[in-house]
Structure formats: structure tokens, C-alpha cells
Amino acid sequence: MRYALGVEYDGSEFQGWQQLGEHGGPSVQASLQAALSSVADAPVQVVCAGRTDAGVHGECQVVHFDSDARREPRGWMLGTTARLPPSIAVRWCVPAADDFHARFSARARRYRYRLLNRQIRPALYRQTLSWERRPLDADAMHAAAQALLGENDFSAFRSVQCQALHARRHLQAIHVQRIGEVVEVQVQANAFLHHMVRNIVGSLILVGTGEQPADWIATLLAGRDRTVAGPTAPPQGLVFIGPLYPAEWHLPAEVTQ
């Protein structure tokens, strides 16, 4: 039987979502599979909606797995969470259709990047906020970011390690706002390239400080040259909010579009 899980995690202590072999360091995937396998009394493999890098967090990562073990969804949720480290929790578990796929059934994915914008670096929230000491104009960042909307070639914002076959993605929404001392960037797209959100944020920061004009983002997009764009923003400010699925899959409201 196939199940879908909503998983929350603090990525600070992990080398990312994906398990990278025996000597690749701790991963969220390896921890989750070990816990599920313990509950199932049999090996369990999971498939996620979107992989995250080292230090990046997940608010509602969605995974699917198959198991012949007879467990109620609540049993999977509580039993698995009890076997996970404190930095990972299963938020919900529901039965899923046999043809549901956590990655390929998703219609969109959402990320949030938050950075503390003040003179002094963060202490209390240093693992969940990035930091920029120079004053940022969030309104200018928001205006500049709108040039990225639609289906475009995002080569200027992909990492050199990106293994995607092409750089075309449909960016459906991007919003930048200031909330007190925090500048927040929320992005939604059909899919993302490796480091795409962090590279976009790194370039928007240069607009926010006034080092680059608002139309620079559009110029970068058209130029498709990663080497002239801004630096990659640090990972700790990034959260994978989660994917969105069509209602036909009958998943919880927070991941249904």
C-alpha cells in the first residue's frame, strides 16, 4: 500500500535531504527511511517532492512510500516520529493512490527565504535566518523580482553543479516584504533549479542595497550568465514550504492547490 507523509525538519545538522552513500554524512532521507523501516519491520524507501541542500529546512516536505505492513496512518505518524531525531517530525500521514508520486504529481513548489536586516548578526535564530547588515529596500527588491515571472530560461540563477536537462522553469509568484527587521522572499514555481532560489535572493540583495538598479534582474535573466549575477545566499535562511498537488489526490489542504 502507498502512503504520503508530510515531514518537517531543521536542516542544520544534515548534509541535505538526499542520502549520499555510506560516507556522505547524515541526511534527512536516511533518518526517515531508518525510522519507517523500524515501524514496518522491513526496509522502506521514500521518494520526496523536492530535494533540499545542506542547511536548508523543510516545513512540509511531502514523501511517498510503499509498505505491506498493516499500520494505521496515525501509527505510521506517531511511531515514525518517535524514532526520529528531534530535528525531524512527521506532521501527517494519509493513504495515497497507487499512482501518486510525491515528485511527479506535484503541480508547484514553494520556498521562503528570510534574512535578518540589522547591524548585529543573529544569535537566537542563527540557524534559521540569514543576515545582511546593510540596509535593504524590500520594495525595490520586490519590484525588481517581478521581471522573473513567467516561463523563462533561468541559467543566470542555476548552480554549476545543476544536473537539470534544461534551465526553463515557470516562476508563478515571487513576493518580497519587510516584517520588522526581517526581509522575506517567497517564491512559487512549477520546479526549481539547483540553488535557484538562493541565487535569486543573492542578486536581489544587491538591488536592495542600491548597488544595482532594479532593471538589473531583468538584464541578468536575459543574459543567462551565472558569472555576472549576485552571490549565492547562505542556506540557513531557506525553507522549503512544500509542494502543491491537484485536489484529485485528496491530500491535506496545506499541500493542495
Swiss-Prot record:
The keyword Nuclease does not apply. One of its GO terms (biological process) is tRNA pseudouridine synthesis. The active site is at residue 53. It catalyses: uridine(38/39/40) in tRNA = pseudouridine(38/39/40) in tRNA. Substrate binds at residue 111. Keywords: Isomerase, tRNA processing. It holds the Pfam family PseudoU_synth_1. Its EC number is 5.4.99.12. It is an enzyme of class 5 (isomerase). It comes from the Bacteria. The keyword tRNA processing applies. One of its GO terms (molecular function) is RNA binding. Belongs to the tRNA pseudouridine synthase TruA family. Formation of pseudouridine at positions 38, 39 and 40 in the anticodon stem and loop of transfer RNAs. This is tRNA pseudouridine synthase A. It comes from Xanthomonas euvesicatoria pv. vesicatoria (strain 85-10).
